[in-house]
Design a protein with these regions (language model features):
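Conserved nucleotidyltransferase catalytic core and NTase-mimicking acidic/glycine-rich helix/loop elements
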Residues: 118-248
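Metal-dependent nucleotidyltransferase catalytic core
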Residues: 1-20, 25-39, 44-95
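Short amphipathic alpha-helical segments, especially helix-boundary/capping motifs
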Residues: 4-6, 19, 52, 67, ...
Length: 248
């Protein structure tokens, strides 16, 4: 499947549903070498004036579509909100996407802004954030050492896998991701890590956790290793901290 096909379909959708749009960007896997027969169309539509932003999942012909409708002001508001979280799907879609409609330069302006913000990277990790993740991983490793229940082991191991990737990305100043994007992000800074992690996770789920434990300790080492005794937080946090305790 050539890139021309998803671009054509996305433009047809925009013309049919939003004839007054000033810009549109097609992002996601459909315009990259990663696209598959299951790739959907991620379409960012920009309207003039004051409109309520929206996100809609739909089907256009044979194509599944994720449609993100914004004004330039709402687009910038969402991006400003996402950047402190170190994870922005909007930046990714627009930085890596294709401008399929641009009536007044808005499309190129937002694409360039997305590329600039993406290249600048997320906010630097604080010592507290790194320590929180170290503590969370240490707590999970302790839980795994004493775990004889297959169901509990499943969730401990998957949390170890996810948080190990998050620590690598946080420590290296890279953008975070979720789902398949977490694997892609971590492989960008440590090529092959997701495949290595997959192998040791499978062993751990079968009751052989030694290689997973060793890999997590390797991930922890550049940040100071395991952290448990002496870890302390006080006050009333506004939201759960990354790496918070895994118990009830």
């Amino acid at each position: 499947m050539e890139i021309e096909e998803p671009v054509r379909v996305a433009r047809e959708l925009v013309d049919a549903w939003y004839p007054d749009a000033v810009a549109a960007i097609l992002g996601g896997s459909s315009v990259t070498a990663r696209r598959t027969s299951h790739s959907d169309l991620d379409v960012v539509v920009v309207l003039a004036g004051e409109r309520e932003p929206s996100r809609t999942s739909l089907r256009f012909g044979a194509w599944p579509v994720e449609l993100f409708v914004h004004t330039e002001a709402s687009w910038r508001w969402f991006v400003r909100r996402e950047i402190p979280r170190r994870r922005s799907s909007m930046l990714s879609m627009c930085a890596e996407g294709v401008v399929i409609l641009d009536r007044d330069g808005t499309g190129a302006r937002l694409r360039d802004a997305a590329r600039e913000s993406t290249a600048a990277g997320p906010p630097e990790a604080t010592p507290e954030e790194l320590e929180d993740l170290r503590y969370g991983l240490t707590d999970l490793l302790d839980d795994l050492a004493g775990c004889a229940h297959a169901g509990e082991r499943l969730f401990i191991v998957t949390e170890l896998a996810r948080r190990s990737c998050e620590l690598i990305l946080l420590r290296t100043g890279a953008w975070q991701g979720g789902g398949k994007w977490l694997a892609r992000r971590v492989d960008e800074v440590r090529p092959g890590f997701s495949v290595e992690l997959d192998g040791v996770v499978r062993e751990a789920l079968e009751g052989r956790p030694a290689r997973l434990v060793a890999l997590v300790d390797e991930v922890l080492a550049p940040s100071g290793g395991r952290r448990w005794e002496g870890y302390r937080r006080s006050g009333y946090p506004g939201s759960p901290a990354p790496g918070s305790h895994t118990g009830p």
